[in-house]
Amino acid sequence: MAELLLGVNIDHIATLRNARGTDYPDPVQAAFIAEQAGADGITVHLREDRRHITDRDVRILRQTLHTRMNLEMAVTEEMLAIAVETRPHFCCLVPEKRQEVTTEGGLDVAGQRDKMRDACARLAAAGIQVSLFIDADETQINAAAEVGAPFIEIHTGCYANAETDAEQAKELARIASAATLAARLGLKVNAGHGLTYHNVKAIAALPEMHELNIGHAIIGRAVMTGLKEAVAEMKRLMLEARG
């Protein structure tokens, strides 16, 4: 069984920063801490509306990361140009709707083969490895192999959102079957979306999995497990100011 890697998505550090229009918390600092804690890579989604990660974040992260940068992005001319200029180690192509809270589903690779083939070729020519964010669907997996993507990232949202054990088991079986097919076609398999401390183990146990990209759950846990130290430090500074 191959080594399983963790890509930490730091988008929500930027979400918190942008909520008040400040320069903190700094996604670059968060990336450094994540790397020190064992992250194998850092994932950021540069959305068209720049709601969290910014172009500046992407440039600085590319220059400062000690691990690998995975840039999630829509398949648009603007984003392709940014990727070719920035040259992250990986690009994960995702569908994007401006009104969505987070990415809601996988790419329709089968329905836009030429567009995906061109994007994969353009990124590969810049030395960037490409993954396609797709549902655990046989048609989409076959299409991903056809358009020349070396990686897929299986959308685990339906698994994560399953309301019963039976539903979750059904979704897990779909993901396992999809991963087996992808590996048979020569694709490397990543997964992500909605993975938490409570549901990650079953996905991590699948032998075909190469990397899991997880963000919201990690940042949410960090708010709690790091909160004691943050509160104590603030109180110390306040008392220090009073002499």
From Swiss-Prot:
Active site residues according to the UniProt entry = H45 (proton acceptor), E72 (proton acceptor), H193 (proton donor)
Q: Where is this site: Transition state stabilizer?
A: E153
Q: Which GO terms describe its biological process?
A: pyridoxine biosynthetic process
Pfam families tied to this protein: PdxJ
Name the top EC class.
Answer: transferase
Q: Which GO terms describe its cellular component?
A: cytosol
Q: Which GO terms describe its molecular function?
A: pyridoxine 5'-phosphate synthase activity
- EC no. given is 2.6.99.2
Q: Which reaction does it catalyse?
A: 3-amino-2-oxopropyl phosphate + 1-deoxy-D-xylulose 5-phosphate = pyridoxine 5'-phosphate + phosphate + 2 H2O + H(+)
Q: Pathway it belongs to? A: Cofactor biosynthesis; pyridoxine 5'-phosphate biosynthesis; pyridoxine 5'-phosphate from D-erythrose 4-phosphate: step 5/5
- Binding sites annotated in the UniProt record for 3-amino-2-oxopropyl phosphate: N9, R20, G194, G215, H216
Q: Where's it mainly located?
A: cytoplasm
Sorted keywords for this record are: Cytoplasm, Pyridoxine biosynthesis, Transferase
List the coiled-coil residues: none
| Annotated positions binding 1-deoxy-D-xylulose 5-phosphate | D11, H12, R47, H52, T102
| Function summary | Catalyzes the complicated ring closure reaction between the two acyclic compounds 1-deoxy-D-xylulose-5-phosphate (DXP) and 3-amino-2-oxopropyl phosphate (1-amino-acetone-3-phosphate or AAP) to form pyridoxine 5'-phosphate (PNP) and inorganic phosphate.
Mind telling me which NCBIfam families this protein's record contains? Answer: pdxJ (TIGR00559), PRK05265.1-1 (NF003623), PRK05265.1-2 (NF003624), PRK05265.1-3 (NF003625), PRK05265.1-4 (NF003626), PRK05265.1-5 (NF003627)
Concerning its family, UniProt says: Belongs to the PNP synthase family.
Assembly and oligomerization: Homooctamer; tetramer of dimers.
Q: Which HAMAP family match?
A: PdxJ
Q: What is the protein name for this chain? A: Pyridoxine 5'-phosphate synthase
What is the scientific name of the source organism?
Salmonella typhimurium (strain LT2 / SGSC1412 / ATCC 700720)
